Amino acid sequence: MTIISFDEVLKLKKACDEKFKEHVHFHDACGGQYFTLETDSDEIRKFIADFMQKMNYKVVFDKSGMSFTLE
């Protein structure tokens, strides 16, 4: 699991809000960082994966597709 800066978190959250009106929840704890979505959407997941790939991160979604970490 990769830890990213808060500025990068804000860029992702802003991009998702502007394109989809989707609120991406950011969770930062001692065990690391992870994100959760409110909407189950393949389009949003693809957008997030592509957006983060441009920043040299790989998105790893859990089985539900509603939570993800970065590598």
What is each model feature region?
Residues 41-71:
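Detector for the mature cores of small, proteolytically processed
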Residues 30-36:
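Surface-exposed aromatic
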Residues 1, 36-37:
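A generic structural signal for short
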Residues 1-30, 65:
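N-terminal acidic leader/helix
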Residues 10-12, 37, 70:
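Generic detector of leucine side chains in alpha-helical contexts
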